[in-house]
């Protein structure tokens, strides 16, 4: 079995994707610790994480786990209450591991590995051309009516403004920021394509979950004095921050 590294605060970093799939970026191959962390997440937020689809991302490890370790991790995550459905695309070793495990690779994660590869030499400088006019930003999306339980609303490449409520079990997602002028009882995911500068603004905060660029916080982690208040949510050093609006 591969060696264990216990220098991390968490063995696995869980981030929420825009289509309800979580990405578990494995930081250390400590299988019992990874499984226990996932079990605790499911216990704390069963409606959010119970039977959630999870992608395993081994890209941050110095070596790919062997087959026995990977199988033990998949079995343990199943027992913890989630459903490992794929591996994040990576090296040829991860490709082989996915075949041995009988799970697919998710091509969505291909770019993050390819960007780390050695870049080809730059082309010779060309004659300077006048810069084209800056493209106008995409107009924000506005939702005038309530977003009800089971509904999902996605604002692609723009901000999202909801003039009514977001009910429990509903999900609003934006590549930009999210502004909610009613009560937020469901989930709000801003910066869905990885924008860490996105924010969430809400007049009446009871969210099941808020996330920015995949980093999330559930209601149980929110101080009681912020519930029912007008708040803003932002990301600071990969940590979700929530504060009341003056």
Swiss-Prot record:
The keyword Cell division applies. SUPFAM superfamilies: Cell-division inhibitor MinC, C-terminal domain. Residues 116-140 are annotated as: Disordered. Keywords: Cell cycle, Cell division, Septation. The keyword Iron does not apply. InterPro entries: CAP/MinC_C (IPR016098), MinC (IPR013033), MinC_C_sf (IPR036145), MinC_N (IPR007874), Septum_form_inhib_MinC_C (IPR005526). Pfam families: MinC_C, MinC_N. Disulfide bonds: none annotated. GO terms for biological process: cell morphogenesis; division septum assembly; regulation of cell division; regulation of cell septum assembly. Residues 119-136 have a biased composition (Pro residues). NCBIfam families: minC. Cell division inhibitor that blocks the formation of polar Z ring septums. Rapidly oscillates between the poles of the cell to destabilize FtsZ filaments that have formed before they mature into polar Z rings. Prevents FtsZ polymerization. HAMAP family: MinC. Interacts with MinD and FtsZ. Belongs to the MinC family. This is Probable septum site-determining protein MinC. It comes from Xanthomonas oryzae pv. oryzae (strain MAFF 311018).
């Amino acid at each position: 079995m591969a060696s264990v590294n216990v220098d991390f605060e968490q063995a696995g970093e869980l981030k929420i994707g825009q289509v309800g799939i979580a990405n578990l970026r494995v930081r250390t191959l400590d299988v019992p610790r990874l499984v226990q962390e996932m079990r605790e997440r499911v216990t704390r937020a069963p409606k959010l994480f119970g039977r959630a689809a999870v992608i395993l991302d081994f890209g941050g490890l110095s070596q790919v786990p062997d087959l026995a370790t990977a199988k033990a991790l998949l079995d343990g995550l199943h027992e913890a209450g989630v459903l490992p459905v794929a591996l994040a695309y990576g090296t040829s070793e991860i490709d082989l591991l996915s075949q041995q495990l009988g799970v697919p690779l998710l091509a969505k994660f291909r770019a993050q590995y390819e960007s780390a590869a050695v870049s080809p030499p730059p082309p010779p400088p060309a004659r300077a051309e006048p810069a084209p006019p800056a493209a106008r930003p995409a107009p924000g999306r506005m939702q005038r009516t309530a977003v009800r339980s089971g509904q999902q609303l996605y604002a692609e490449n723009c901000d999202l403004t909801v003039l009514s409520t977001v009910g429990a079990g509903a999900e609003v997602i934006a590549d930009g920021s999210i502004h909610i002028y009613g009560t937020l009882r469901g989930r709000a995911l801003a910066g869905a394509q990885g924008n860490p500068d996105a924010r969430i603004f809400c007049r009446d905060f009871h969210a099941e979950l808020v996330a920015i660029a995949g980093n999330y916080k559930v209601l149980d982690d929110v101080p009681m004095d912020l519930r029912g208040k007008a708040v803003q949510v932002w990301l600071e050093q990969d940590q979700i921050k929530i504060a009341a609006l003056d």
